[in-house]
Amino acid sequence: MSKKPFISVIMPIHNEEAYLLCSLESLKQIEDQIFEFIFILDRCTDNSEALVRRWFPDAKIVKKEICKWKNSIAENFQIGFEMSKGDIICLHDADVTTPRNMLSVLEELKNDVASVGLTLLTCKEASFLNRLYYYWEKTRRFAPLGEEPIGALRLIRRECLEKVGGFKDVIAQETQLDIDFRKAGYKSKVVTNVTCYHLRKFSFKKAVRSQIQAGKARKQIRMPFWRVLGHAVLRLRPFTLYGYLFKKEDDHHESN
């Protein structure tokens, strides 16, 4: 980009104190390059607020007690977007680390590119299951139609986000966002040379729940059955197919 942009970082938080400290510490490294920080405290009952105020005392903080949307994460991002002023919107999960060179991806945000996501890697040191998941993630490259942008940490041009009307109250809000961008003539991409780490510990129960939710999301956006089947087989995610075929999509109230 030709000039230094104003960047607004939006981070929704729902009882994330187990991972939040590492996330905030890494984000602090690029504080002088960020225009504003917006933290959405979504029904937090832990020590998350104190951590945010300690590390970012001048940040904008919203304490949300009631959810009006079915997907509270999507609602949190929309709240942050509406109160932000930056030219670039950075969507940042609370359990993800910020690389020092994150802003190098700004060069990709030009012409018809609306959104750039960083490559997300699982922190394999967190647990044995995390280590297995770390290596399983490499199957994403063999998924039908190739690797697609994912959430966790991405930067978006404000003008593009405004054009598509912001976030929608759907199960997979960022997948829907990419669909909206394509319909508006924009592209979303992921860079492989800048990575961030997912700190959360995995469990079998969480993995199954995540796959079922992903299947419901694919059904909601009317993804073709053949593609869901290929995804489930090639990436070893059988419960995605179960969620797509047998679960209703109407009740998708989610928190971070």
Language-model region placement:
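Short, acidic, metal-binding catalytic loop of nucleotide-sugar glycosyltransferases
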Residues: 25-34
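Conserved donor NDP-sugar-binding/catalytic core segment of glycosyltransferases
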Residues: 97-128
